[in-house]
Regions:
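A structure-centric signal for secondary-structure junctions around beta-strands
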Residues: 33, 51, 96-97
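Short strand-coil-strand connectors
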Residues: 31-32, 65-69
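Structural motif
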Residues: 61-63, 70, 86, 96
Length: 116
């Protein structure tokens, strides 16, 4: 369905229930080859064995784990995460991160492995 998503209006409960770390995610597009969601909050370090991911940072600055490095990110950055790559473990400087996440193929419910 053609649509315009006003990402600036997507806050709090509009993104769904928060998990135990305060992370929220709402999928807006689910197609044959990908899903598109808006994510808000901090996530523990994890990986997806079968899903590639791209995150476009909308709000928040700080660091995230990408592979074996902790890297700084800011609004406007695009993070490319090939399947099997450890990522997350966000450390914001102030406001939690808000990002658009594109996953291909669409992520299965059991395709997240938490890491130390």
């Amino acid at each position: 369905t053609a649509q315009i998503i006003h990402t600036g209006e997507m806050e709090g409960d509009k993104l769904g229930d928060a998990n135990k770390t305060g992370f929220r995610s709402r999928t807006f597009v689910s197609a044959d080859g990908a899903t598109v969601s808006i994510q808000d909050g901090n996530v523990p370090k994890h990986m997806h064995p079968n899903t590639n991911e791209m995150q476009f940072i909308l709000e928040g600055t700080g660091t995230v784990w990408l592979g074996d490095k902790e890297v700084p990110v800011k609004p406007g950055d695009l993070i490319v995460i090939p399947k099997g790559t450890p990522h997350g473990g966000t450390k914001p400087n102030g406001r939690p991160f808000k990002a658009i996440a594109i996953k291909t193929p669409p992520q299965a419910p059991d395709d997240t492995k938490l890491l130390d």
